[in-house]
From Swiss-Prot:
This is Aspartate carbamoyltransferase catalytic subunit. The gene is pyrB. Pathway: Pyrimidine metabolism; UMP biosynthesis via de novo pathway; (S)-dihydroorotate from bicarbonate: step 2/3. InterPro entries: Asp/Orn_carbamoyltranf_P-bd, Asp/Orn_carbamoylTrfase, Asp/Orn_carbamoylTrfase_sf, Asp_carbamoyltransf, Asp_carbamoyltransf_Asp/Orn-bd. The keyword tRNA-binding does not apply. Keywords: Pyrimidine biosynthesis, Transferase. Catalyzes the condensation of carbamoyl phosphate and aspartate to form carbamoyl aspartate and inorganic phosphate, the committed step in the de novo pyrimidine nucleotide biosynthesis pathway. The keyword 4Fe-4S does not apply. It catalyses: carbamoyl phosphate + L-aspartate = N-carbamoyl-L-aspartate + phosphate + H(+). Its EC number is 2.1.3.2.
Amino acid sequence: MEHLLSMEHLSNSEIYDLITIACQFKSGERPLPQFNGQYVSNLFFENSTRTKCSFEMAEQKLGLKLINFETSTSSVKKGESLYDTCKTLESIGVDLLVIRHSQNSYYEELNQLNIPIANAGDGSGQHPTQSLLDIMTIYEEYGSFEGLNILICGDIKNSRVARSNYHSLTSLGANVMFSSPKEWVDNTLEAPYVEIDEVIDKVDIVMLLRVQHERHGISGEANFAAEEYHQQFGLTQARYDKLKEEAIVMHPAPVNRGVEIKSELVEAPKSRIFKQMENGMYLRMAVISALLQ
């Protein structure tokens, strides 16, 4: 694999290969490769806890040496372009770049680089490693995707997770539905929009999305009061109680407790939210291994 930029660039067989390797790392069936003497730099131009720390843990476990990069103290503050920043890191011997950026498809500016790039999120575009860890979590639960009914709820328009998961899960055979305020509908995605209360007792997976307040300021979109949103579109106790016995709840996090999901349900028996985070490290080890081998 040359780069990991978008879920649309991955075939179903490549997806299965990556989640299989990640599952084998997790179970201990597959020994961890060691990339001693190779260097990685994580360039995060947007805030992150899970993705950044998960990549760092994966890199450390694989023996990579981390070249620290902080946007606040870099020449980006002097106006240096993303390409020149990345070309500099390539020139001094960095072997892999992990990049999160607010610009959709930022990687199109970097096609002259000769080192692999792992996209850790581009604006409201794609978040391939999040999608892959979600797929891994679903696979652990069900062993297949064919015919699963998946409801993705929330800020569809501004969510790179919704976009990545829609394409990949549909390709794998799942039935994806959206539930969203009309202000946050994305008409470029062809999944049907439904009322959450009409389907909550029929779905296999409820995938909640964070309300992207930071992107609403840019687009001038309407905001909701927390309780208003929670009652109309969130996972309340009443909705949780209607879920099928074997249904699971997912969220890419960070979670706005009491908004997308009732706080007490974050670690409820059907929740796989922290399992997703655990799987993220193993999945990112699989991605790094595929990019460097």
